[in-house]
Amino acid sequence: MATESSESEEEGKISGGNYKLIIDDDLREMGKNAAWSVSSCKPGNGVTTLRDDNLETYWQSDGLQPHLINIQFQKKVKLQLVVLYVDFKLDESYTPSKISIRAGDGFHNLKEIKSVELVKPTGWVCLSLSGTDPRETFVNTFMLQIAILSNHLNGRDTHIRQIKVYGPRPNPIPHQPFQFTSMEFLTYSTLR
């Protein structure tokens, strides 16, 4: 899994963040396969800024809370990790403090799967979607919704600089010091 953000003793509270994003090789970024939408945005700070790989740009909501980010897939996918880049030092009252992550087949049946409280985060914040059961390492879903329920310092609108969504690789190869380059070699990579 990725390097987790520091989680306090109280379940669901996350403080800090990581300046460098480190993701395991057995995860892949799934956001490029999705249709992204937001509940509202200021002109010039739309949904594309969430995915442009630029930490200087940000999505800014424009309206009443909760602010919603919708991630819809054409087919059911396995998702394991949501990673946000937020910066309390730059954004102050625009920084999210309470976030709810919901999953489902569409808007009609979304269920909350994770609720977290961020405490002055700066950097990449990793939110694992795994359940309490150790066998539940991912969520199988058509849609993921990230709801910003409140901001720091009672701010109204929110800033999120980047979002990445990761799922397990379909056929992870056991950790080896090299990668096979041909399909023929790949077929002999494991024993039955």
Swiss-Prot record:
Give me any GO biological process, just one.
regulation of DNA endoreduplication
For this protein, the record's Gene3D superfamilies field holds: Galactose-binding domain-like (2.60.120.260)
> Does Nucleus appear among the keywords?
yes
Keywords assigned by UniProt? Cell cycle, Cell division, Mitosis, Nucleus, Ubl conjugation pathway
What are the record's GO terms for cellular component?
A: anaphase-promoting complex; nuclear body
Q: Does the keyword Nucleus apply?
A: yes
The record's listing under SUPFAM superfamilies reads: Galactose-binding domain-like (SSF49785)
Looking up InterPro entries in the UniProt record yields:
APC10/Doc1, APC_su10/DOC_dom, Galactose-bd-like_sf
Q: Which CDD domains match?
A: APC10
Q: Which family does it belong to?
A: Belongs to the APC10 family.
Give the protein's biological function.
Component of the anaphase promoting complex/cyclosome (APC/C), a cell cycle-regulated E3 ubiquitin-protein ligase complex that controls progression through mitosis and the G1 phase of the cell cycle. The APC/C complex controls several key steps in the cell cycle by mediating the ubiquitination and subsequent degradation of target proteins such as cyclins. The APC/C complex is required for the female gametophyte development and is involved in several other aspects of development. Involved in the control of endoreduplication.
- Subunit notes for this chain? Component of the anaphase promoting complex/cyclosome (APC/C), which is composed of at least 10 subunits. Interacts with CDC20-1, CDC20-2, CDC27A and CDC27B.
| Name of the protein | Anaphase-promoting complex subunit 10
Q: Which organism is it from?
A: Arabidopsis thaliana
